[in-house]
Design a protein with these regions (language model features):
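Retroviral integrase
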Residues: 1-38, 488-496
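Long, low-complexity, charge-biased intrinsically disordered regions
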Residues: 30-566
Length: 566
């Protein structure tokens, strides 16, 4: 300790040796001492919504450093080091005092279906400490929420076998690094040399991108076409016939195809990448359960819903309008993310209510927590399944979209809400597969109900035309925007005034809508939109996406996506 005199006459004691020790750079794995639970809380804010949701439903137990000496932990570490060697992920280099990036062990036990899986040990690089990290590209596409339902619909319609394929140690099977990363291996590696990485270990910022680039390169070499509007979807078209496709979500691949696809793609892909598992029949994929039965494909999240937890509420007398504490706000946002994910995949009846709460989090109160718990209770009270069936030849199908709007029912009665439901339909049998549904706040302030309905219809047509073009590209292997020979789009609106404006030559009275109306008419003249029909409100499937409705209204939509019939 040393006494230091300040200019104002005061004196303080400082321990410089301790300060230097605290700020000394960490270069060895033994020096790392981290509270894993605290680090998980801090890092969870930077994770994407899907990762947060899956971790909540399938909790991960972190093994503390004090237990690293145990035999099962040591065995897991040994296997991880063997993976680095088997995938030729590094070269040894003499220790000449080179700058190196710190590494650490992360040992976890993943609980699925109430059973603890074997311990998993991973060597993680402190990629956040890498030099020039701000210049690295780390983006890589993952399948969109609507792509999953579209892919399952096509698989059911074509009679494809659906499989879940997990790539073993995906980052170590990605493209080689194009820069130098030197690390000091852990003591379990039993070497005094440094490692010069050749592959992107876990923690390297662009590891996911390097794996995606390698996967895309291999699939392209095998003859698959990458869909331009969704880079995570690859289709295999041979001699004008669709034989299968691959949907990628990092190292989780959803494959569907016939015998030709299995021979020419799946088997050859297994020769390039080492698979850790291949599942078919019934399996979990990205937090969802997918099963095939009686030529139908079923998608549900029952286990996920069962694991949703209510928000603990301390109910004080006359304090419903009390502002939330920081910890309460964090819990609320977590639950909103979990229910939003559920509403996007299998539960459209929750969309409006959870979106409305999400828009009001800034001014959330104790009453907001109670409202969120009511939504969770509603989610648990219904076990809905989305089913996909064979509709018929693709050339006979149409894309049908329902659009609806509620005028000035958000942001203190200033903003309006739009809702759309998009279906793939066989008009002759009225059999359908649900592809997407959306609830969104209309960004521009609407001056009338007609304005809100027009903007909702415009957004619905954009979504439907986009899906029609993706389907065309999936089946043709390419797309020509100058020749829009895609599936026709049929729109349904319950606004009589909007329908009349589209079917007569009279100019729209509201100037702000003239360009939008003209754009929709142009799509109709080009044949991209086959027709826009009026439908009574009691048959409007999107009605429950724009307002709080009676249970019977939302049950109508749930019944359609479950039974595949209008």
């Amino acid at each position: 300790m040393k006494q230091i005199e300040l200019e104002d006459g005061r004196s303080i004691e400082r321990d410089f040796e301790k300060d230097i020790e605290e700020w000394k750079p960490v270069t060895e794995i033994e020096d790392v001492s981290v509270d894993l639970d605290a680090e998980k809380d801090q890092s969870s804010q930077s994770l994407n919504c899907l990762s947060d949701v899956i971790d909540e439903a399938y909790p991960i137990e972190h093994i503390k450093r004090a237990d690293y000496f145990k035999a099962d932990v040591q065995e897991a570490m040994r296997k991880e080091i063997e993976k680095y060697k088997s995938f030729n992920a590094f070269e040894e280099d003499d220790d000449m005092g080179q700058d190196n990036v710190p590494i650490r062990w992360v040992v976890t036990k993943h609980a699925i279906d109430g059973k603890n899986q074997p311990l998993k040990a991973r060597l993680c690089i402190r990629g956040d400490l890498e030099k020039d990290k701000e210049f690295l590209r780390s983006d890589s596409p993952t399948a969109g929420k609507d792509t999953l339902k579209l892919a399952l619909s096509i698989a059911a319609n074509e009679g494809f076998t659906v499989k879940n394929v997990d790539i073993k140690s995906a980052y170590l099977q990605g493209k080689d690094l194009d820069r130098e990363i030197i690390v000091r291996p852990p003591k379990e590696a039993e070497t005094k040399k440094l490692w010069r990485l050749k592959k992107a270990a876990y923690g390297v910022l662009d590891g996911g991108r390097l794996f995606y680039l390698r996967l895309a390169e291999v699939l392209t070499q095998l003859g698959l076409h990458k869909v331009h509007s969704d880079g995570a979807l690859f289709t295999f078209v041979k001699e004008g016939k669709l034989h299968g496709f691959v949907v990628s979500h990092v190292d989780d691949l959803l494959m569907a195809g016939d015998g030709v696809f299995e021979t020419e793609v799946e088997s050859k892909l297994s020769e390039v990448f080492e698979f850790s598992k291949v599942e078919k029949g019934t399996f979990n994929y990205c937090g969802c359960s997918i099963s095939t039965e009686d030529e139908k494909i079923y998608l549900h999240q029952h286990e996920y819903v069962d694991k949703l937890q209510y928000i603990p509420v301390k109910d004080y007398v006359n304090q419903s309008n009390r502002c939330l504490t920081q910890s309460e706000m964090k819990i609320l946002r977590g639950r909103i993310g979990e229910v939003l994910w559920l509403s996007l995949i299998t539960r459209p009846d929750l969309s409006f209510e959870v979106n409305k709460i999400a828009a009001e989090t800034t001014n959330a109160t104790l009453e907001t927590l109670k409202s969120m718990n009511r939504i969770i209770k509603k989610a648990k009270s219904i076990k809905n399944t989305v089913s996909f069936s064979k509709l018929g030849p693709m050339k006979e199908l149409v894309v049908r979209v329902y659009s609806d709007a509620s005028y000035n029912n958000q942001d203190e009665q200033i903003r309006s809400t739009a809702g759309t439901v998009t279906l793939l339909e066989h008009p002759a049998t009225e059999s359908v597969n649900a592809i997407s549904w959306k609830t969104r706040k209309i960004k521009r302030v609407c001056r009338s109900v007609k304005t809100a309905e027009t903007r909702a219809l415009d957004e619905g047509l954009d979504e439907a035309v986009h899906i029609a073009r993706i389907i065309k590209e999936i089946y043709n292997g390419n797309i020509n925007l100058r020749q829009p020979d895609q599936l026709p789009v049929i729109a349904k609106t319950d606004s009589k005034s909007v329908w009349e404006n589209l079917h007569n030559t009279r100019q729209c009275e509201e100037r702000i809508l003239r360009n939008t109306i003209a754009g929709i008419k142009e799509l109709m003249e080009m044949g991209i939109v086959k027709e826009v029909d009026w439908v009574p409100t009691n048959l409007q499937l999107a009605d429950c996406l724009t307002k709080s409705c009676l249970p019977a209204k939302s049950e109508t939509l749930l019944k359609v996506i479950h039974t595949n019939h209008l």
